[in-house]
Amino acid sequence: MMRSITTILTATILLSLSACTSKPEYGSEPSMFLPGSARQTWAVAPAVNLSGVAQADPILQADLLFSQLQQTAGLNVIPVNRVVEVLAALRIEQVQSEEQAAIICNVLGCDALLVPTITAYDPYDPPKMGASLHLFRKTNVMNAGVDPRELVRRATPKPNESTPARSSFLQVVGMFDAANGSTRAAALLYAQGRNDPAGPYGAKGYLIEMDRYSGFVYHSLIEELLLKPALADAR
């Protein structure tokens, strides 16, 4: 009887040790770096929702983009709520011109304003999201003694007015449909190091929770934006 109990205890201990040694480990995600050696400060405006889906909340989407930007070495990011306060003070519903963006940058004291746009948003498996990032870099448009709200009014495009050429404007665009095998593989690769490998969903959680999938989308667009030669030249 004692021998039987000892055998059972030994087997239990061995199984426990085996479970401990085979526990999956977290992966490591690659880092993102702002080109150049000097730090910059960027601000994120509320997203422009063109998807027609109310679930794509402009403030939440901006916060998700803000979280991704914070992981970029060499970059300081102003919280979204501060940007919202400035937009309200300047009576701007959404940025409509490079001149308006420059005024906002001057008020916030930042180097650039990043405006996300949502063009498609389907949170159901397989998720799909279309988005673009518009980076407006600061220019010297402020006039001493002039109310910033008056400058904003002057910088607002008139109806049917053509948009002038933009010298300090960068844009990246993408459609991320998880029904596409390469997109799905990229999302799962992004999830490595960002999920609990012992959790119920593991990396697949990024294909189930839309906020996580949105993070993948913004991360991909930021990576593309940071590779723009014009961004490096501006340094």
What are these regions (language model features)?
Residues 47-49, 82-83, 118-121, 132-141:
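Solvent-exposed coil/turn segments that connect beta secondary-structure elements
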Residues 38-41, 73, 109-114, 127-132:
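Envelope-exposed proteins and targeting segments
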